[in-house]
């Protein structure tokens, strides 16, 4: 097409160990979102490949990879707005076909770990603050017990204390 592309990432290589937490940090425009988009399969690299457990994600199949192996929590939370917080988290299990006898209690415990009260869990999503909605989105990812959870600005709408609480919850879950 004659247009020259800007290189955002050049010869980037990352390896991650199970049970560890990593942060992609950098200045605005440094490639953080691009890195997450590539790792999630939302974008395809111009060169090279993205491996997950030693297999190219293109060969795994992007639908299978995104449905079974990873969860993505971006700045837009993709919550179901006609449900309350608890129903949103339980729906993530239903969509994945995960059956649990203790589904309600399990999802409620995750939401409570992330700082939502039982009353807040019963509230319509639109009645929750941006930070509370963010915690619901994170709870949806945690509930599915994915091998890899990718978060972009996962603490961006939270104050310093709640941000630290979220990071500590991720650390607890990783251990």
Residue ranges and their predicted role:
Residues 25-27:
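The feature captures the beta-strand-to-loop junction immediately N-terminal to the Walker
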Residues 40:
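Helix-to-loop junction immediately C-terminal to a conserved catalytic motif
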Residues 48-56:
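Conserved ABC transporter NBD signature motif
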Residues 101-119:
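Conserved ABC ATPase "signature" region
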Residues 124-128, 132-134:
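Conserved ABC ATPase signature
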């Amino acid at each position: 097409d004659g247009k020259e592309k800007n290189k955002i990432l050049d010869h980037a290589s990352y390896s991650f160990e199970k049970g560890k937490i990593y942060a992609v940090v950098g200045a605005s425009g440094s490639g953080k979102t691009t890195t997450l988009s590539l790792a999630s399969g939302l974008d395809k690299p111009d060169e090279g490949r993205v491996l997950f457990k030693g297999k190219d994600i293109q060969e795994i199949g992007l639908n299978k990879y995104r449905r079974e192996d990873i969860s993505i929590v971006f700045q837009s939370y993709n919550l179901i707005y006609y449900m309350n917080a608890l129903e949103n988290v339980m729906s993530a299990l239903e969509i994945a076909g995960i059956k649990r006898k203790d589904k309600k209690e399990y999802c409620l415990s995750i939401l409570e770990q992330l700082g939502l009260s039982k009353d807040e869990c019963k509230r319509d999503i639109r009645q929750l603050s941006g930070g509370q909605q963010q915690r619901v989105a994170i709870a949806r990812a945690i509930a599915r017990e994915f091998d890899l959870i990718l978060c972009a600005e996962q603490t961006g709408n939270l104050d310093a204390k709640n941000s630290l609480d979220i990071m500590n919850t991720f650390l607890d879950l990783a251990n």
